[in-house]
Amino acid sequence: MTVRILCDFDGTVTTQDNIIALMQAFAPADAFEPLKRGVLDRTLSIQSGVGQMFALLPSDGKTAYLDFLLERAIIRDGFSELLQYSRRQGIDFSIVSGGMDFFVEPILAPFLEQEQIYCNVADFSGPFVHIDWPNACDAHCTNGCGCCKTSVARTLRKDGDIIIVI
């Protein structure tokens, strides 16, 4: 039996939602705000809304986006201690985030290995940012989550495992 912690990132490990902060700083408000409202009032799925939000951002701004978030990201008090406790107890700890690899992984690099992070992938190869969804909803979820935490949990879970979701 393995005990696994699956922990959210934006607004849980960090004190703010990084996607919202990024969009408020770089996306045109007249295009971003309706998408944000749609996601919050659930008229748009997270996958659809967040995908459309990132499509507002020119790909050539990647360095500026990352610098902005690295400057502002604050890791919540107690996170490091939670990781230390998990390691001492032999608890498998993973981040399952609706955030994007280009900022989630560098922010967490001092704490976790990349293999412990499940998130979406930002593609900067075109004129605007495109999001790939490697952890999208499986056949048991139709919510359009983007990074579907329950799907990741089902993928990782083995018989007898205990899953703790934060």
Locations of the language-model features?
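Catalytic cores of large soluble enzymes that bind and process phosphate-bearing ligands
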Residues: T14, S45, E71, C141, ...
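Short hydrophobic segments within beta-strands
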Residues: L6-D8, V96, I166
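Metal-dependent phosphoesterase signature
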Residues: Q47-E81, Q89-I91
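Active-site neighborhood of HAD-like aspartate-dependent phosphohydrolases
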Residues: M1-A55
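Short, contiguous strand/loop micro-motifs
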Residues: L22, L69-L70, A139-H140
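C-terminal cap/substrate-recognition subdomain and adjoining C-terminal extension
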Residues: M1, I74-D92, G99-I166
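Short, surface-exposed acidic
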Residues: D30-K36, K62-L66, Q114
